[in-house]
A protein has these predicted regions:
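Active-site residues of response regulator receiver
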Residues: 64
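Receiver (REC) domain active-site loop signature in two-component systems and cognate sites
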Residues: 67
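Non-catalytic signal-transmission and effector/linker regions of two-component phosphorelay proteins
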Residues: 1-15, 120-152
Length: 152
């Protein structure tokens, strides 16, 4: 059975960029998302994540908040300030307090997933974020209906 066979109904394969300095979390997230049919890009630092986002333009970015050198807040700020990556939806996954998570949302994240996460719940949450962002982008790109020309 292929990995795509495990995808939730109505959800095509998406590219998800995961940015986390913890190699165990990075590999766990990668395995879970691949098992649900997604293409996963891995970035062990914020800087690598930003470079991958610019080059690959994933459908969704998952970013950890607590990382050395460049934390999640700085990563989100850089992504949202860049014309190439500005529209890519970003979800924070963090063990931070609710106040910190809210700062990430105010900085541009569309939401957050608390750590530690349940392996059975994470793919469903990612699917919900993808469905919401795909629906929003479809509404934004659908041209308005043209009215038939009227005779003078």
């Amino acid at each position: 059975m292929s990995a795509a066979a495990h995808s939730p109904p109505g959800l095509r394969q998406f590219t998800v960029l995961v940015i986390d300095d913890d190699s165990l979390v990075l590999s766990t997230l990668t395995d879970l998302l691949r098992a649900h049919g997604h293409r996963v890009l891995e970035a062990p630092t914020g800087r690598v994540g930003i470079e991958l986002a610019r080059a690959e333009r994933p459908h969704l970015i998952l970013v950890d908040h607590h990382m050395p050198e460049m934390d999640g807040l700085a990563v989100v700020g850089a992504l949202k300030a860049d014309g190439v990556t500005r529209r890519i939806p970003v979800v924070a996954f963090t063990s931070a307090s609710a106040a910190e998570a809210n700062r990430l949302v105010r900085a541009g994240c569309i939401g957050f997933i608390p750590k530690p996460f349940e392996p059975g719940t994470l793919p469903r949450l990612v699917a919900e974020f993808l469905r919401a962002t795909v629906a929003r982008s479809r509404r934004a790109t659908v041209p308005p209906r043209s009215r038939p020309a009227t005779a003078p």
